[in-house]
Amino acid sequence: MAAPGEALTSSGYIAHHLSNLSLAKLGLVADEASFWNVHIDSLFFSWFTGLIFLGIFYKVAKRTTAGVPGKLQCAVEMIVEFVAENVKDTFHGRNPLIAPLALTIFCWVFLMNVMDLVPIDFLPYPAEHWLGIPYLKVVPSADVNITMAMALGVFALMIYYSIKVKGLGGFAKELALHPFNHPLMIPFNLLIEVVSLLAKPLSLGMRLFGNMFAGEVVFILCAAMLPWYLQWMGSLPWAIFHILVITIQAFVFMMLTIVYLSMAHEDSDH
């Protein structure tokens, strides 16, 4: 970060906007790489967007009428029906948790992604100059810690339901005797299945992070390389395209979650 009164260079501007407000930067943790180095801004905005989701759906649920619905109620009902149809088509088990979980994931990830459309300096500038907060990243899904935490949550549910539906022995048998149902192939099967199992949360979290981080970098580059009065020329076309990206990424995260949990509920014959 530049010294007080000193303007940031383009590279400094980019580095500054890609830095999280963390416990290490506040001097509360010794090292940025520490396990206990929490990214405060990512946590705050993930909670903030989660509360927005809860607030909107609670408001609609309290005011739902049998008559002519309002615009907000129509939008919420469309989202609920959209998610319910995808769960019905993809998930073939019986679990009342899956549809609410899929709805929560889709809406929450979408709202976190939407933060990428907030102008780059709209929140960091007043935070730094009025509140004394030196760093502020407002896109939680552009933080690998957030996306991997969500992916690990899905992974934990996968393991839980795999053991619950198939039993511990059935789950172990599925890992050991698939794809080759022969005792001599158990080490090879375990290698394949364990790698495949671990790749699911890794790809789930990294896919969302990679797409959102790349989008954030493009917005920052537009802001860093163009004068303030021309920044909209670079940012606006990308923002319009990015609306599609943030929606698709929320949908992909939701669908993969449904697919993985559906696989966990399948009773294997191996």
From Swiss-Prot:
Molecular function via GO: proton-transporting ATP synthase activity, rotational mechanism
Segments traversing the membrane: 38-58, 98-118, 143-163, 208-228, 239-259
Gene3D superfamilies according to UniProt: ATP synthase, F0 complex, subunit A
S-S bridge residues: none
GO annotation, cellular component aspect: plasma membrane; proton-transporting ATP synthase complex
PROSITE patterns reported for this sequence: ATPASE_A
Principal subcellular localization: membrane
Coiled-coil annotated spans: none
Annotated localization: Cell inner membrane
Topology in membrane: Multi-pass membrane protein
UniProt record, GO biological process: proton motive force-driven plasma membrane ATP synthesis
Keywords, sorted A to Z: ATP synthesis, Cell inner membrane, Cell membrane, CF(0), Hydrogen ion transport, Ion transport, Membrane, Transmembrane, Transmembrane helix, Transport
Function: Key component of the proton channel; it plays a direct role in the translocation of protons across the membrane.
Entries under NCBIfam families matching the protein: ATP_synt_6_or_A, PRK05815.1-1
Subunit record text: F-type ATPases have 2 components, CF(1) - the catalytic core - and CF(0) - the membrane proton channel. CF(1) has five subunits: alpha(3), beta(3), gamma(1), delta(1), epsilon(1). CF(0) has three main subunits: a(1), b(2) and c(9-12). The alpha and beta chains form an alternating ring which encloses part of the gamma chain. CF(1) is attached to CF(0) by a central stalk formed by the gamma and epsilon chains, while a peripheral stalk is formed by the delta and b chains.
Family (UniProt): Belongs to the ATPase A chain family.
Entry protein name: ATP synthase subunit a 1
Record organism: Vibrio campbellii (strain ATCC BAA-1116)
Gene that this sequence comes from: atpB1
